[in-house]
Every structure is written in C-alpha cells, then in structure tokens.
Amino acid sequence: MPVLAVDKPLNLTSHDVVNRARRARGTRRVGHTGTLDPLATGVLVLCVDDSTKVVQFMEHDSKDYLAWVSLGAGTPTLDAEGPVDATAPVPPLDEDHIRGMLTTFCGPQQQIPPQYSAIQLGGQRAYAVARAGGTLELPARNIVIHSLDLLRVYPSVQAAPRMFSATPEGWSPDPQGQAFSLPEPLGEFPTLLLRASVGSGTYLRSLARDLGAALGVPAHLAGLVRTRVGRYDLSGAVSLEDLAEAPGIPDLEALDFPRIQASERLALELRQGKRPRHTAQGRHVVTLEGQLVAVVDGDGEQLKVVRAWA
C-alpha cells in the first residue's frame, strides 16, 4: 500500500486526517510521519497498511514552511488560538537588520517547546497541564534550523500575501498561485513573512516566540503552511476529497536513503538478521530486483539490520 502526501486543511487535527484516511481507504492501519497543528495547513504524510512499517524512517525528514510571525502580541499557545496575553509597541523594523538576526537562529540550536504541546514529562502531557492552568519546566531540546529567510515585513498579517507558487528557491508570493488559509487574526500587528527549512522536532511556534524576544517584543505565529516533508512537496499533495483514489508512492520510493543493490546471498543474510561484511557507511536501503529487503546501518565494515522485509 502507498505512502500519501495530504494537504491538511485548517482547523483539523492530524488525527482527524488519519481518521478520514481510514474511512476513505477502508483500513485501520494508517499513520502519519509528523504532527501538524490544527491552525497549520499543508503537507501531512500518511502511511497506509504495510507502509506503516516505514513511518519510523520518515519521522526525521526535514521540513519546509511558510510562516507569518506577528510582533507585539503574545498568546499562551504561541499561535493565533489566543487570547492575547501580552502586548508591547513594536519599534521600527529594518529588514536588513532582521535578516542579519535570522542568521543567528540557523544551525544547531537549543529550543524550549511550547507549553501547549504533546511533550510528556513525568507522565503528564504538557498541553493537559497548561489547559488546567499549570506549567511544566520543559527542558530545551536540540534542533537544527537549516535556513530562515525573510521574504518581507508587512504592517499586519491581513496585509501579507496568501497566494503562493512553488519556485526553485521555495514557495513564493504569486497573485496567480495557490491560495492558503490562515487563522482569524487576533489584531493588526507588524508581521514577518518567513520561509523556513528545519529539522525534525523544531516548533515554529517556539521560533516565533524566540524571534519576538530577540526583537524585544512578544510575538505569536499568526499562520503556518508546511510546504515540504522530505521528498514530498505541497505541489504534489492530494486533498482529503481525493484520498480514496490517490495512488501515492510505494514504500521503496518513499525512503530517502542511498541504495544498495543486493545479491541473493546478501538479501538472505540480512533477512536472517546476520551482519554481512560491506563497505557502506551510514543508513542505506537494500533492494533485490526492485523489491525492498532491509534498512541497514553500515560502519564501513559490516551492515546492521534496522528492519528487514520478508
């Protein structure tokens, strides 16, 4: 069964989309490779039936986003769910200064997740504690931000573009492009339109908070569109209405690792859980006559099976 890239609509949870896919495909075996918040839209990758076996190898794929960051107003959830619980006047914004500041956020970083998140600490979900009026001391996590580009500063999120097209540089404003849905604005606040490429585990809501802090004001994520997950671009994503008939792509094509073309003997040894000698280094996908045999880790001397397929 296939791997599918779905264009998640606004105000649906990732689990809502999984449930719809289960009904559309007639199976309970559907999983996703990375949660997308209800107030975000864009690429949500689903694995169906036997493809659920590859979820663990896709959860760490890098992701691209368009983000609308509104300055001068903070919220408990760090997004447009509201209510606004902190405000401050925003000083004049110089785009060159902001672009220079954004470079300091690129590369390996330490990031504190939002209180309203599914992170579990001491047996408690952070969002459950937050909704009950409490807080958890969430430790900072190691993340990577590959690139962070300021497209433009706008006087408000209402004034910022909503229509975009895919370009070689990434998704860019285009009056003839695809229209994106954003949450209802919480007010008229100066807004940064950003294009971001990040590693797994990065919270764009936390990034919005931290960008505001660097500029000396509260901030929140006023809108978010995920435009890419791994090799899946939004331009190739299907709508919920087309889920039932969407062909998707096979497991083998979904795995974005170098390939090893196996002999019959190598395939048999891997399926038996052995550690055959091989010069490959790092994670690889092993195939035999176009069929998936195993995902392996190589150290330059031998292969260790991470998962094998019969």
Curated annotation (Swiss-Prot):
HAMAP family: TruB_bact (MF_01080)
Organism domain of life: Bacteria
Alphabetical GO biological process terms: mRNA pseudouridine synthesis; tRNA pseudouridine synthesis
EC number: 5.4.99.25
Gene: truB
Family: Belongs to the pseudouridine synthase TruB family. Type 1 subfamily.
Pfam families: TruB_C_2, TruB_N
Enzyme type, top EC level: isomerase
Catalytic activity: uridine(55) in tRNA = pseudouridine(55) in tRNA
PANTHER family: PSEUDOURIDYLATE SYNTHASE TRUB1 (PTHR13767:SF2), TRNA-PSEUDOURIDINE SYNTHASE (PTHR13767)
Protein's UniProt name: tRNA pseudouridine synthase B
List of catalytic residues: 37
Function: Responsible for synthesis of pseudouridine from uracil-55 in the psi GC loop of transfer RNAs.
Keyword Isomerase in record: yes
UniProt keyword list: Isomerase, tRNA processing
GO molecular function: RNA binding; tRNA pseudouridine(55) synthase activity
Keyword field contains Methyltransferase: no
